[in-house]
């Protein structure tokens, strides 16, 4: 009898595959919209911390209304620095404003997809987006991928570039460093290829080191057979 595939084990939900959220600093979201829709709130950066669950550092900010929030730290943010959230906030690093109030050509990050959702786009270390143009009912933003996306002018974003850039410039060099990199987030690593497994572990397994059968499979295949190119229209190079 064969053994369960990795994706079958993952679907069971055992601790091996669960995210260790108890190690993470917490959710990073903007202050609810009803607090900052008509007024600007001042906050002070109390601490900048490493977050194992992110590629960027986070900052703990205490606001004048008594709320404490975690924000994604931009490059150049300092402990003790004052930041502002609201429609009248100055266009300076670390401040959060509606897209309608941000000039064209400004670097921004942590952009809301829908007004009030707390920030969804451009949150990884070293990333930034660019305000390209604006129209009456939308603002065009260039995302890190180069895609131009239209946002509601009331969506909020933070001025600056996310800290933590250059993280991938230093090579890992050895497998031991990769081990600790993945262990921090409880990632299943290493992940062997199916053709390198024994026949009992994978449909492509065995000692031939090639699949030995077509790599395309049906969308309706049973879980233990659903590997390879699932419901593929074509495989290989385009002709």
From Swiss-Prot:
Keywords of the record: Ribonucleoprotein, Ribosomal protein, RNA-binding, rRNA-binding
Biological processes annotated in GO: cytoplasmic translation
Compositionally biased intervals (Basic residues): 222-239
GO cellular component: cytosolic large ribosomal subunit
Ranges for region Disordered: 1-20, 203-239
Family named by the database record: Belongs to the universal ribosomal protein uL2 family.
Name of the protein in its database record: Large ribosomal subunit protein uL2
Species annotation: Pyrococcus horikoshii (strain ATCC 700860 / DSM 12428 / JCM 9974 / NBRC 100139 / OT-3)
Name of the coding gene: rpl2
């Amino acid at each position: 009898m064969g053994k369960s595939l990795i994706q079958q084990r993952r679907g069971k939900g055992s601790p091996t595959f669960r995210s260790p959220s108890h190690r993470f600093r917490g959710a990073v979201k903007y202050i609810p919209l009803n607090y900052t829709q008509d007024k600007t709130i001042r906050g002070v950066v109390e601490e900048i911390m490493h977050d194992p669950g992110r590629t960027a550092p986070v900052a703990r900010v205490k606001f004048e209304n008594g709320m404490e929030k975690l924000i994604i730290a931009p490059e150049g943010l300092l402990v003790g620095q004052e930041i502002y959230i609201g429609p009248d906030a100055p266009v300076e690093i670390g401040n959060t404003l509606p897209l309608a109030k941000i000039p064209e050509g400004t670097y921004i990050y942590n952009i809301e997809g829908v007004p009030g959702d707390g920030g969804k786009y451009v949150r990884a270390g070293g990333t930034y987006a660019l305000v390209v143009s604006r129209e009456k009912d939308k603002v065009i933003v260039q995302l890190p991928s180069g895609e131009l996306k239209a946002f509601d002018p009331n969506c909020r974003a933070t001025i600056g570039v996310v800290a933590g850039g250059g993280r991938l410039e230093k090579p890992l060099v050895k497998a031991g460093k990769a081990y600790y990199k993945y262990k921090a987030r409880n990632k299943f690593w290493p992940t062997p290829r199916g053709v390198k497994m024994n026949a009992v572990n994978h449909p492509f397994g065995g000692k031939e080191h090639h699949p030995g059968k077509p790599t395309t499979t049906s969308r309706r295949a049973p879980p233990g057979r659903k590997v390879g190119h699932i419901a593929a229209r074509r495989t290989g190079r385009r002709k």
